[in-house]
């Protein structure tokens, strides 16, 4: 169980060498969150990793809020592309 970082970056980058834009960061966090969510269906008592999951969710929320405030159109496209709520 792992994420394919390179393909996620390729699908969400804004320019040729982009790896740090909010879109890429949110997409990577979303993949890691989905992976951990599957992990918790099996390992219900893994509270240490649950803390990491909550930190990732909060970090993603912050990045999405930033993107929404700065460039609303990019925010809307990203939400639709990743299938996130809102």
From Swiss-Prot:
Give start-end positions of Polar residues composition bias: 1-10
The record's annotation in CDD domains points to: Ribosomal_S15p_S13e
Q: Which domain of life is it from?
A: Bacteria
Native organism is: Xylella fastidiosa (strain Temecula1 / ATCC 700964)
Instruction: Name the Gene Ontology biological process terms.
Output: translation
Where is region (Disordered) located? 1-21
MF terms from GO for this chain are: rRNA binding; structural constituent of ribosome
- Give the family from UniProt: Belongs to the universal ribosomal protein uS15 family.
Subunit structure, per the record? Part of the 30S ribosomal subunit. Forms a bridge to the 50S subunit in the 70S ribosome, contacting the 23S rRNA.
| UniProt KW keywords | Ribonucleoprotein, Ribosomal protein, RNA-binding, rRNA-binding
GO cellular component terms, alphabetically, are: cytosolic small ribosomal subunit
Please explain the role this protein plays, according to its UniProt record.
One of the primary rRNA binding proteins, it binds directly to 16S rRNA where it helps nucleate assembly of the platform of the 30S subunit by binding and bridging several RNA helices of the 16S rRNA. Forms an intersubunit bridge (bridge B4) with the 23S rRNA of the 50S subunit in the ribosome.
For this entry, the protein name equals Small ribosomal subunit protein uS15
